[in-house]
A protein has these predicted regions:
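Short gly/ser/thr-rich secondary-structure transition/capping motifs
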Residues: 17-25, 89, 148-150
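A short beta-turn/loop motif at secondary-structure boundaries
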Residues: 28-31, 159
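Short, flexible active-site-adjacent loop segments at beta-strand->alpha-helix junctions, enriched
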Residues: 28, 42-43, 50, 55, ...
Length: 208
């Protein structure tokens, strides 16, 4: 954990606790000393803030390349260990960087939908999370984040002081699929299983 991440995590956790009284369930499901993927629904650009504040482990996100486009952004996201990804282009370098981080026993966050959806509506999951999980041979913890759309909807600048909730599901193991990260059928099946578990935590059905 870098000094910058540690400082931002401390300040962010205090801010989130003060403003949002976040309820966290199942934190113990995030394994402590091994590589693990957190796969979450995505309702708001505020999700990473809530998720980081809910978790004691340093988290590494796949962040869109636009966030690295200026000096401050590149310094901030690089210094805190975030992984640059060019959305919509199957960024192989970014996925390999995620695999490398997992093999170093780090925790990597995926938002499989690839963009935000209003409320707790679930979009179709992309297979990048499955490809990485199967190549790195690590468990996936499904995560459900509630109410962040109401806290900071798309296009809004300032968060509302509303309560948030984060639920960490039990880790998913895909032993029978490991080593099949380039198998399209396998990655589609694993992606479906991951999304179904996220949907279950949200109390919804995955319809894709």
């Amino acid at each position: 954990m870098t000094w910058l991440y540690r400082t931002l995590h401390f300040l962010g956790s205090y801010f989130v606790a003060l403003l949002h009284r976040t309820e966290v369930i199942g934190r113990e499901n995030v394994l402590k000393k091994q590589g693990v993927i957190l796969a979450s629904n995505h309702s708001s650009y505020y999700d990473p803030v809530i998720l980081c504040a809910s978790m004691w482990r340093p988290l590494h996100y796949l962040a869109k390349t636009e966030l690295f486009s200026n000096r401050f952004g590149r310094f901030l996201f690089t210094a805190t260990g975030q992984i640059e990804v060019e959305r919509g282009k199957g960024d192989h370098e970014a996925l390999q960087n995620a695999i490398n981080a997992l093999k170093k026993k780090k925790a990597v966050v995926f938002f499989p939908e690839g963009t935000t959806f209003e409320g707790e509506k679930l979009g179709k999951g992309h297979t990048g999370v499955a490809r990485v999980a199967l190549k790195a041979e690590v468990p996936v913890v499904p995560v459900a984040i509630f109410n962040t759309w109401n806290i900071l909807a798309r296009g809004k600048r300032f968060p509302k002081f509303l309560k948030a909730k984060v639920v960490f599901g039990e880790p998913l193991y895909f032993n029978e699929y490991y080593g099949r990260g380039d198998d399209k059928k396998a990655t589609r099946e694993v992606t479906g299983k991951i999304m179904q578990n996220i949907a279950a935590l949200l109390g919804k059905k995955y319809e894709y």
